Amino acid sequence: MNRILRLRERLFGLASWDASRISDEWFRAHFEYAADVVNHWVGGVLDIPSSRFLNFGCGDGITDLSLVLRYGATSIHGVDVRQEYRKLPRIAREQLGMQRIPVALTFQTIKSGDALARAGRQYDGIMSWSTFEHVRRDQLATILADLHACLRPGGYLFIQIEPLFFSPYGSHLRRYDDTPWHHLLASEEDLWRVIESHEGALDPAEVDFGFADFGVDGYKRFVFNEYKALNRLTADELVEFAKNAGFSVAREERRFLDMPVPDSLAGQYPKEWLLNNEIFLLLRKNAV
């Protein structure tokens, strides 16, 4: 079947699409902003149309779709522990009027800690968008070493994390609780009460395509459990884990928020942790 689809696409080209149809803000953010950032960081060191990519933590695959449609990517394999990517054909129809997904995209469900290098595939580039804060801390070293093994010599891994745990909204719960550093100031029980009692509409850019699967109350519980499972990784720790896995840092950018730090936190945590909201990290596997 895949061979037939490839032949069809070769003969007739990609299915038509129209970005002016986009109505969902989550889709827009990942189709436009996230893809633009990946292209900015990865496109400067790799030729996107001729490179083979792995997306570690691909989610719903929207960013991958954009990289194909807007930046000419021809081979992206997305992996994730969830199966949100199965919704991509429907999402693409609704948001772009697109009748079929490009054959450049393939997806796979994995389990946490699966050794991807065993498949024997070598990639020119790997990307990971807001995923590594969700990786179990005791698996970080193993997973980064595995991703290193998945890259060809001279290949690149791009990692983005936002928000980092100790930053003002590092709980990933801002859609329900806009109090800066509340996760560091309140007990887990008090924090859950705030989430549980929340009423009203959410920021559309924070409502992903999995929301309907859970319902209002179920989604609250889902994101709160995700919060409890965060690995509390700092930017310095991420860089150290990556270096220990064999990567060299090709480029790095850390973004900070300009906010007054509560006195009660200033003595507990380094100021850099508390204000460092985001990291962009481009890593290289040295050539043989």
Report the location of each language-model feature.
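A short acidic, Gly/Pro-enriched loop at the edge of an enzyme's catalytic core
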Residues: 116-126
